[in-house]
Amino acid sequence: MAKAKFQRTKPHVNIGTIGHIDHGKTTLTAAITKVLHDRFPDLNPFTPFDQIDKAPEERQRGITISIAHVEYQTEARHYAHVDCPGHADYIKNMITGAAQMDGAILVVAATDGPMPQTKEHVLLARQVGVPYIVVALNKTDMVDDEEILELVELEVRELLTEYEFPGDDVPVVKVSALRALEGDPRWTRSVLELLDAVDEFVPEPVRDVDRPFLMPIEDVFTITGRGTVVTGRIERGTLNVNTEVEIIGIHEQRTRTTVTGIEMFRKLLDEGRAGENVGLLLRGVKREQVERGQVVIRPGSVTPHTQFEAQAYILSKDEGGRHTPFFENYRPQFYFRTTDVTGVVTLPKGTEMVMPGDNTAMHVQLIQPIAMEEGLKFAIREGGRTVGAGQVTRIVK
C-alpha cells in the first residue's frame, strides 16, 4: 500500500461537479472521496452520499445557496470540491461565484446523454468563466452497447464545442460512480482515471498573490501631520512601500500617488499581500480626492467602465427578492466591491420581462465609472436590499 506524504506545498485547485439532475453528480463526489480514502487513507476522509446531499445553506451576497464542500488529495494536488444538491443552487453558485471553480467535472449519464440542464450548466460555465471541463460519462456499467457509448461521447463533445470549449481535446472518462462506491475494482480504477485526467487537464490557477495589485477602498481618513490613509482588504497582488499606485473609479479623473506607509493592526509593514486588511498612507493626496468605492491599483492594470454585459440571477420572492417582474429600463443599484452605483438595464432581444427566480443576460449602463474586468461580481440592490446577483461577462465601454 503506497503511503503518500502530506505536503503543504501541494498545489491547491478548486473544482466542482456540474450536470443534469440525477446524472450522478453527488454519487460521483462521494465515490471520489471513497476511492481516494481507500488509496491514501491518511490523506483523505471518506464523505458519504447523504452527508453531501444534505448540504448546509450559505449566504452569499444576500442569496441563500446550499453547497457541499469536500476536500481530497491526489498524489499531485490538494482539491476543494463543491457539489450542489439542487439545480437552482448550481445556477446561483455559478453566477454569484460563491464557490469559485478552476475547473469542472461535467457528469453526463451514458443512459440519457446530454439533457437540458447539461446544456444550461455548460453555457453558464462558459459565461462565468469556468476555464476547463473534464467529462465523467457516468452509469456506463448500465450500457452494454459500445456504439451507444460512442454516440453519447460524440454528443457531449459537440455540445462542448458549441459553447467554445475544446470539445475534441476534453478528456471523456467512462465511470460508474455507484459501482465505485460499492468497491468494484474495475469501476474504482475508472474513478482514479478520472482524477488523473483532472490532474493533467486542469492547470494550476494563478494565485491571487501573483496577480497585479488591487485594493478596494472601504474607508478614508486623515492623520494629522502625515496625510491621507485609505483602508481596505487587498483583493490580489502584493504592494511594497514607496510604490506608485493609481486610484480609479467613481470619478472621471484618476489619481496617481505613492504609498509611503503600509499599516496592519497598528504595525508598519514593508509590504501588504492579498487577503490582508491594511491602511495605506498616500503621498500628497487630499481627503476629498478619494472615497469608498474607488480602488487602488498597480498603474494601468485595470480601467474604469460604465457599460457592460452581465449574467444575473434574480432572487425569488421566497428568497426575499422582488415580488414582481422587472422590465426594460429597470434602474436598480449595482453593488461592486464596496459601493452602490445606479445603472439602467437593457434586456436581451425577445425578453420582455424578468421574473423573480429567473436567471438572465443583461446590458447595463452605469451612471458612474467602476474599475472592472470580465468576471467581476456584483449584487443588484434596491434601497440596500439585495434582489439579485451577477457577474460581468463582457465590457462594452
UniProtKB/Swiss-Prot annotation:
CDD domains linked: EF_Tu, EFTU_II, EFTU_III
Query: Residues annotated as region G2?
Result: 62-66
Q: What class of enzyme is it?
A: hydrolase
Instruction: Enumerate the residues binding Mg(2+).
Output: 26
GO MF annotation list: GTP binding; GTPase activity; translation elongation factor activity
Name the NCBIfam families for this protein: EF-Tu, PRK00049.1, PRK12735.1, PRK12736.1, small_GTP
Name of the protein: Elongation factor Tu-2
Q: What is the species listed in this Swiss-Prot or TrEMBL entry?
A: Streptomyces ramocissimus
**Recorded name of the encoding gene:** tuf2
